[in-house]
Each structure stands twice: as C-alpha cells, then as structure tokens.
A protein has these predicted regions:
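Phosphate-coordinating catalytic segments in nucleotide- and nucleic-acid-processing enzymes
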Residues: 1-96, 183-184, 188-190
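Walker B catalytic acidic pair
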Residues: 104-105
Length: 193
C-alpha cells in the first residue's frame, strides 16, 4: 500500500482504489489518516471505526465497524455515497498544500445534506493553499459557495475564458438580495458571463 510520498494519485470510490488510497495515507501519514477517519465518523452516523491493514501481498484491506454491531464489514458493503465521501476525505487529507485538487462532480451519490459540508472542507483546503477546481452540475453545492468562489469556464473556437461569477453586477445584486448561487445558475443566469 505504501509508496514514496508524492502528489496524491487519483482516488476513486471503487473499493480497490479506496483501499489503496486509505492504505497509502495510513502508511505514510497515520495522523492524517486518523483525521480523515474522524471526519468520516462525524458525517456518517453509527460508524464506530475504520481499520486499514496491509497484507503480505502489499494490498490494503479496509474494515469498518458499526456502533451497533460488533461484526466488522468490508469496504464493498459500504454505501457508494459513503465510499465517495471517504475518497474525498482521504484526498483532502493527503494533498500537500499548494497543489491542484481537481474534482469532477463531487456531489454524485452524496446525500444532499452533506454538500454544504463538502463545500466547507474544500474551502478549508483552499485557505491552506490548495487550489481547488470543481466541475459540478449541483445547484445545492453552488448554494454553499459565494459568488466570488465560483468561476465559470467557457470554451469556444478562440479558446477558454474564465469569469468570476462575483464580477457580474447583475448576479451580485440578486445574490445580495438573497438569491442563492445554485438557483441563479439553474435559471440560466450564469450564461451571460
């Protein structure tokens, strides 16, 4: 599971990728692995523990313990949304400061109530110097951001343009009047950027 510390590899929510990422963080930075597990336990009611073990073949096995059942269960038995959340938490705890963290549709399969928390976690990573780039189609995730945190990328024949949603006086006026960014986006008002 261990490899020399470098920029984090791609982390997926599939069981093998998740076990590999967890094992890498557990072996290289056990204190950060513990923080990722604590963050997962905080967001998944009833989750008592997560254990990572490296076998003789070098592969990691993840075992989860429910607070209401003494029997540990395997990562394959974990709900897909919980696996995705754990993948994001592992990545956020592994990525070194001043890195680029690119996430495509991080909202997929996550409980909608977790989207504001995900936004807060990504914001915290950004404040620590990590550049965070998200591609999303989730108004609920956009609602957890400020207009100044939202960049709109447009591609046309001449290239790619980047515009901050907060630079639009019209959007800012609506936002300051109480409209949520996700609702503005869903209404097509970002198209003018």
């Amino acid at each position: 599971c261990a490899r020399p510390h470098a920029a984090p590899a791609e982390v997926g929510a599939d069981p093998a990728s998740l076990a590999q990422a967890a094992g890498r963080l557990h072996a290289q930075q056990p204190e950060r692995f513990a923080l990722a597990v604590a963050a997962l336990r905080q967001r998944v009611p009833g989750l008592a523990a997560v254990e990572a073990e490296t076998g003789r073949d070098g592969r990691c096995t993840l075992r989860f313990r429910d607070a209401h059942d003494e029997e540990a269960f395997d990562v394959q038995q974990l709900a897909e949304g919980t696996r995705r959340l754990f993948a994001w938490l592992l990545l956020l705890h592994e990525v070194p400061p001043h890195s680029l963290l690119a996430l495509e549709t991080p909202e997929c399969r996550l409980h909608p109530d977790l989207l504001p928390e995900l936004a807060d976690l990504l914001r915290a990573a950004s404040l620590q110097g990590t550049q965070v780039l998200i591609a999303t189609h989730a108004p609920a995730l956009l609602n957890a951001l400020t207009l100044d945190e939202i960049l709109c990328l447009r591609r046309d024949a001449s290239g790619v343009s980047v515009t901050c949603a907060g630079a639009s006086e019209d959007l800012r006026a609506l936002y300051e009047a109480g409209e949520a960014p996700g609702r503005l986006w869903a209404q097509g008002l970002f198209e003018a950027l």
